[in-house]
């Protein structure tokens, strides 16, 4: 009997040890499975990556007077949504993709045409992109006078200058205070078999000063199919003073040239856009602008115009803007336009890191 009790105690202890060991093994296996599942939630292709979803919704209500009729109209000041992703795959090397589409608030609220759609590789030697992108002429020149809450801003540049270019190959390099940009359009369905447009530009930034220069040469054709080429040389100077006064002036010289046999004559035109912004209270800002467009046509078919706008802007927070604008646009050969607009703008941006 004395021998039996120790044997029973030993058996019970052994069972407990086996159960504990089994539980420990099960726990270790469970933890390993959880770690594996958590790893599956972050696929390797998203490591060292960043994805941003962003947008800007900009409805407006305008009272329009073209000297003959006056109307009220809900319009849109270039609302858009977009997504941008980048992945660093080597030290200083990244792959980038971006898509951005307009939102047609003025009508049914549908997604409109693509504003940007491209892929790029960024490296210490510069960035190369292919697809629909911003040209140097806008990025380095026009953007600095594009401060107004209107779909046609900058008002002179808007008539006959590029905001986005499709079928576009671009290169960009930043060296110190200089930004170099080059782009070439290759559209096999129209224009030359080679390049249809070339845009070169350089920007200089130091402290509160920006100076930008851009040059465009672009293939064109008249209504009879006779080819020609347009050449544009433009520049901008923008400066923010110590009292937060912002002032920018942009000018472009435009040459319209046609080959022999064209009914159109060679001509010279220009665009002038100015922009001023000044904070008057903590959350309020006043904006002023003067603009002038000349197409070089010397008869009554000319679309020459000039004008000005004044804007009072309220920014209660960084991503919310409410504005009241008066726009006056005077044409040489057609009825003048006047508009009073109240508008709202809401910006958002969400970013995920892998």
Per-segment meaning from a language model:
Residues 2-3, 7, 14-129, 164, ...:
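Beta-barrel outer-membrane channel/assembly domains of diderm bacteria
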Residues 59-65, 101-105, 134-136, 175-177, ...:
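Transmembrane beta-strands of outer-membrane beta-barrel pores
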Residues 73, 156-160, 256:
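Extracellular/periplasm-exposed beta-strand and loop segments of Gram-negative cell-envelope proteins
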Residues 105-111, 160-166, 186-196, 224-229, ...:
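Solvent-exposed loop/turn segments connecting transmembrane beta-strands
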Residues 132, 140-175, 179, 185:
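Solvent-exposed adhesion/ligand-recognition segments of exported proteins
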Residues 146-150, 267, 305, 340-343:
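Flexible, surface-exposed loop regions and adjacent strand-edge segments
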Residues 197-302, 307, 352-354:
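Detector for outer-membrane/organellar transmembrane beta-barrel domains
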């Amino acid at each position: 009997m004395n021998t039996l009790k120790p044997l029973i105690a030993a058996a019970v202890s052994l069972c407990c040890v086996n159960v504990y060991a089994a539980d420990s093994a099960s726990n270790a296996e469970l933890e390993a499975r959880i770690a594996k599942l958590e790893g599956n939630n972050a696929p390797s292709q998203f490591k060292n990556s960043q994805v941003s979803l962003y947008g800007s919704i900009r409805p407006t209500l305008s009272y329009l007077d073209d000297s003959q009729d006056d109307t009220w109209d809900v319009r849109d000041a270039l609302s858009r949504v977009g997504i941008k992703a980048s992945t660093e795959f080597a030290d200083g090397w990244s792959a980038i993709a971006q898509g951005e589409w307009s939102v047609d608030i003025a009508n049914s609220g549908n997604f409109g045409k693509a504003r940007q759609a491209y892929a790029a590789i960024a490296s210490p030697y510069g960035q190369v992109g292919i697809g629909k992108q911003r040209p140097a002429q806008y990025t380095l020149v026009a953007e600095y006078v594009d401060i107004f809450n209107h779909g046609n801003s900058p008002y002179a540049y808007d008539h006959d200058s590029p905001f986005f270019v499709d079928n576009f190959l671009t290169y960009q390099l930043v060296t110190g205070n200089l930004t170099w940009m080059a782009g070439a359009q290759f559209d096999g369905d129209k224009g030359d078999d080679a390049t249809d447009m070339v845009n070169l530009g350089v920007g200089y930034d130091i402290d509160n000063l920006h100076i930008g220069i851009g040059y465009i040469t672009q293939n064109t054709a008249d209504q009879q199919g006779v080819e020609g080429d347009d050449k544009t040389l433009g520049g901008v100077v923008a400066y923010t003073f110590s009292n937060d006064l912002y002032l920018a002036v942009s000018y472009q010289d435009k040459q319209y040239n046609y080959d022999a046999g064209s009914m159109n004559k060679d001509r010279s035109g220009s665009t002038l856009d100015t922009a001023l912004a000044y904070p008057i209270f903590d959350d309020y800002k006043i904006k002023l602008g003067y603009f002038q467009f000349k197409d070089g046509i010397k008869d009554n078919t000319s679309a020459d115009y000039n004008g000005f706008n004044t804007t009072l802007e309220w920014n209660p927070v960084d991503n919310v803007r409410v504005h009241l604008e008066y726009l006056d646009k005077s044409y040489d050969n057609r009825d003048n336009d006047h508009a009073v607009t109240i508008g709202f703008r809401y910006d958002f941006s969400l970013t995920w890191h892998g």
